[in-house]
């Protein structure tokens, strides 16, 4: 908890020293404590005069990148540890372009973080007070719907015959299910089987050693349904 607060204070100090918009989008995935860390980051940002735009539920990382640009933010934070084992969680920072920050920017943010005392150097505001002050705002459904539409608009071909496609999908107990189902429905793919044991978000990832689709063990249950 203290590490997340310290990192966020450093990020806030960095952003406040630039000409970038004083607004940061935050998302988290299904990893343990993701919601808690999201709220703590929002509290710190609000206390530093930065508007925290928070997804109200877990969302995949690309949705965070989209929100940064869609909402005109100066940066973004995703509470995630990608494909690492369940014991980990992480803190990824994205630039105003929605991309992961460059090494040059990372060095500047790290320098700001290192100056922060995690006990006495962090500004905090009560979460509800931040909401009432308009410094903590919820990202609405239109943002995510427009994200799905933007992905759909990149499709290749006219979709002829796609209704015959039979698909097995697994979110690996992560966060992709909602967006993937919406996108497949728009494409006209109706024969979709979701791996039942891996459908529900679960930060313990009980069905595989770690949620990396590049390893066979993670995809084994899906392969068995094919």
Question: What residue ranges belong to the model's regions?
Answer:
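N-terminal small/polar loop signature for handling phosphorylated ligands or for N-terminal nucleophile
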Residues: 13, 17-88, 183-226
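Glycine-rich phosphate/diphosphate-binding loops that line cofactor/substrate pockets in enzymes
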Residues: 7-24, 156-163
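Residue-level detector of functional hotspots within protein domains
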Residues: 9, 77-79, 95
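Gly/Ser/Thr-enriched, mixed-charge loops and adjacent short helices
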Residues: 2-3, 89-218
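Short, highly selective alpha-helical patches that border small-molecule cofactor pockets
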Residues: 4, 8, 34, 38, ...
